[in-house]
């Protein structure tokens, strides 16, 4: 029979109607001669009642055989419940079942289908189709669908054109590692799955499309964490003839539209902006979480003459103050915090506690000559705990920034109801790679340099600034963009600064350079991480919660066992050989 409606959509206005519902058995209970069944579908749960006095023997026997996750079809009259369940939207009604058909049986699930999951991540991914039945997961994907709907409507109204760009692209050396796809037709040649549609969307601007967007899959072979997946989705934008400010305004209004439609929150526009240098110096991060205070304080000038060489001879000495936290941390607990700063290069973590009008701790005796000024500058109050890092400025900023975020979580300083957006602007064009012993692009090699620093492309690369902008939400990089280079001469200078020879630049990017000979307009754009945005809107801490079939931390799918070995025949067709020892070693790990 045709389904009348979703089970979770039945309400008091349906009392007296005979309906047909279909879904899964969430629970079955036998009470006082009656059989009660919670029927679940994507909209929720409704209670079914099978009364042996009014239902046929066939219906009763079928009901007695039901187990969790059986798929059933039921028909019956909607009546008012004797005792309403205020925890359910359907809690004031129930169905008196007159017909019941088992559409499919189910084995006992490896975990109970409920919001408070009691399974580890790999088990959830191994049975993802069951995990996705949980109401919490369905809620996440309804949210995601609404977000994408709002985004498309907003961009369509602004005359952006939705264009699909190639999934089989050319591998380029900049950025993260590519996922490579061998070509059967061109022996020994490979496509790359795109890390972003960066170059193709720029070429669309050269084609005169003026405003492009795409909600697009991207791929990066990089180390994974809670906000990264090997394949992810971004909202990709590109425009012609617009300034940096105009692109930011379009983006802000897009985000404000999503926040209003999805969360009912009115954003105050324009969003705040801080420079990259300010972000690093004040928060120790290029994606600062501004939902709490605890900014970094520069004490380099204050300690330069004290009799403590660790401080006085350090290039930079910076501190953070954990307010009213001294009693929360024993010396042993503080020692463990060293593990937070060491990965950022810090050689140690110094600290003092402030109580009874004076500071105390392992280094307090070295600070007596500046104690009063230190207390005044840091605005210390009773029970405050101060942490110091003395090192190069970059190390001091990065390590204290990580500690700042760690302490905020431990001390419950974060207001999780807040959505704090801000722009980080005035970025360096290049960043130094210790691993490669050279400068690399902070964003990508197509970013337009700021006009007053472009001469440094042949000089001090650390002084080159980019017309680039990142949008940050609650300590996460939500997206980033820039104005792009549209002059061939500037693009060639950029490639040269990055270490490309003229020949290698032509080999990798000759098609782009050639396009710049044909009236390439000024252009710029931005990409927003859709998975990350939805994760934050849903209040989750891992983007796996908002991706239907994600990979685990080893970039594997426990359900399908991807990636997998392929047959020798498939490899032969692609003229490939596999290192058997590498495969054996990988299987043993």
Swiss-Prot record:
Keywords of this entry: Aminoacyl-tRNA synthetase, ATP-binding, Cytoplasm, Ligase, Nucleotide-binding, Protein biosynthesis
EC id: 6.1.1.12
Binding sites annotated in the UniProt record for ATP: 220-222, 229, 477, 529-532
Subcellular localization: Cytoplasm
Example GO molecular function: aspartate-tRNA ligase activity
Single GO BP term: aspartyl-tRNA aminoacylation
Subunit composition and interactions: Homodimer.
Role according to the record: Catalyzes the attachment of L-aspartate to tRNA(Asp) in a two-step reaction: L-aspartate is first activated by ATP to form Asp-AMP and then transferred to the acceptor end of tRNA(Asp).
Name of the protein described by the UniProt record: Aspartate--tRNA ligase 2
């Amino acid at each position: 029979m045709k389904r009348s409606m979703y089970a979770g959509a039945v309400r008091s206005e349906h009392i007296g109607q005979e309906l047909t519902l279909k879904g899964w058995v969430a629970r079955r209970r036998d009470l006082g001669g009656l059989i009660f069944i919670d029927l679940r579908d994507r909209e929720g749960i409704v209670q079914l009642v099978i009364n042996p006095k009014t239902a046929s023997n066939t219906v009763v026997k079928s009901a007695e055989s039901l187990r969790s996750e059986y798929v059933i079809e039921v028909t019956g009259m909607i009546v008012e419940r004797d005792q309403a369940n205020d925890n359910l939207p359907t809690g004031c009604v129930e169905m008196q079942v007159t017909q019941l058909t088992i559409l499919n049986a189910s084995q006992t699930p490896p975990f109970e289908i409920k919001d408070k999951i009691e399974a580890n991540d790999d088990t959830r991914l191994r049975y993802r189709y069951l995990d996705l039945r949980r109401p919490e997961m369905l809620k996440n994907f309804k949210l995601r669908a609404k977000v994408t709907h709002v985004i498309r409507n907003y961009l369509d109204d602004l005359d952006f054109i939705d264009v699909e760009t190639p999934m089989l692209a050319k591998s380029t050396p900049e950025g993260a590692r590519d996922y490579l796809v061998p070509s059967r037709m061109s022996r020994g040649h490979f496509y790359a799955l795109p890390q972003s549609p960066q170059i193709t969307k720029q070429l669309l601007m050269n084609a005169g499309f003026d405003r492009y967007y795409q909600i697009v899959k991207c791929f990066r072979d990089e180390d994974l964490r809670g906000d990264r997946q090997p394949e992810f989705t971004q909202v990709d934008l590109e425009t012609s003839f617009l300034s940096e400010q105009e692109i930011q305004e379009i983006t802000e209004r897009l985000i404000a539209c999503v926040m209003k439609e999805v969360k009912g929150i009115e954003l105050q526009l324009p969003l705040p902006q801080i420079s990259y240098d300010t972000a690093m110096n004040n928060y120790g991060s290029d994606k600062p979480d501004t939902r709490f205070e605890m900014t970094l304080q520069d004490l380099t000038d204050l300690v330069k003459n004290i009799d403590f060489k660790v401080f006085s001879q350090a290039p930079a000495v910076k501190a953070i103050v954990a307010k009213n936290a001294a009693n929360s941390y024993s010396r042993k607990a503080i020692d463990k915090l060293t593990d937070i700063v060491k990965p950022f290069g810090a050689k140690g973590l110094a600290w003092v506690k402030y109580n009874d009008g004076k500071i105390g701790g392992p280094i307090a005796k070295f600070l007596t000559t500046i104690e009063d000024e230190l207390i005044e500058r840091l605005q210390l109050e009773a029970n405050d705990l101060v942490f110091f890092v003395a090192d190069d400025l970059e190390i001091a900023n990065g390590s204290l920034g990580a500690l700042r975020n760690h302490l905020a979580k431990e001390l419950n300083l974060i207001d999780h109801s807040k959505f704090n957006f801000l722009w980080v602007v005035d970025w360096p064009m290049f960043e130094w790679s210790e691993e490669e012993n050279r400068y690399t692009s902070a964003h990508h090699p197509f970013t337009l340099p700021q006009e007053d620093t472009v001469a440094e492309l042949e000089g001090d690369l650390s002084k080159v600034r980019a017309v680039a902008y990142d949008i940050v939400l609650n300590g996460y990089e939500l997206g980033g963009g820039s104005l792009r280079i549209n002059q061939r001469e500037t693009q060639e200078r950029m490639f040269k600064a990055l270490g490309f020879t003229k020949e290698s630049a032509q080999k990798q990017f000759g098609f782009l350079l050639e396009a710049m000979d044909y009236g390439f307009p000024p252009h710029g754009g931005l990409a927003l991480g859709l998975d990350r945005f939805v994760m934050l809107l849903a209040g989750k801490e891992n983007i796996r919660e908002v991706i239907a079939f994600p990979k685990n931390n080893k970039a594997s799918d426990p359900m399908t066992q991807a990636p997998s070995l392929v047959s020798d025949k498939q490899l032969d067709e692609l003229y490939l050989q596999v290192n058997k020892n590498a495969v054996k070693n990988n299987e043993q790990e």
